Amino acid sequence: MRIEQINARALEKVNYDRYLLSQAIAKRVNELINGAKPLIELPKPNMQLTEIATLEIAEGLVKVKEV
């Protein structure tokens, strides 16, 4: 799946609130940096942490709460 499609699906999960999505991605990236395991099987090696976080949100594996 292309990153544009993943971003569109992730935006759907947060009711098209780009600010909320960016906050959720940043929070998940910090969790990954601090040792959390990805919740998805990586479709390609060497994915960036932001791509992993966005894909997890798009798949509904990470719940996003309003800030």
Swiss-Prot record:
EC number: 2.7.7.6
InterPro entries recorded: DNA-dir_RNA_pol_omega, Pol_omega/Rpo6/RPB6, RPB6/omega-like_sf
Record key words, sorted: DNA-directed RNA polymerase, Nucleotidyltransferase, Transcription, Transferase
Recorded coiled-coil stretches: none
Record field: catalytic activity: RNA(n) + a ribonucleoside 5'-triphosphate = RNA(n+1) + diphosphate
Record-level GO cellular component terms: DNA-directed RNA polymerase complex
Pfam families xref list: RNA_pol_Rpb6
Gene3D superfamilies: 3.90.940.10
Family: Belongs to the RNA polymerase subunit omega family.
Known function: Promotes RNA polymerase assembly. Latches the N- and C-terminal regions of the beta' subunit thereby facilitating its interaction with the beta and alpha subunits.
Entry-linked NCBIfam families: PRK00392.6-2 (NF001579)
HAMAP family: RNApol_bact_RpoZ
Name this protein carries in UniProt: DNA-directed RNA polymerase subunit omega
Organism, scientific name: Nautilia profundicola (strain ATCC BAA-1463 / DSM 18972 / AmH)
Name of the gene encoding the protein in the UniProt record: rpoZ
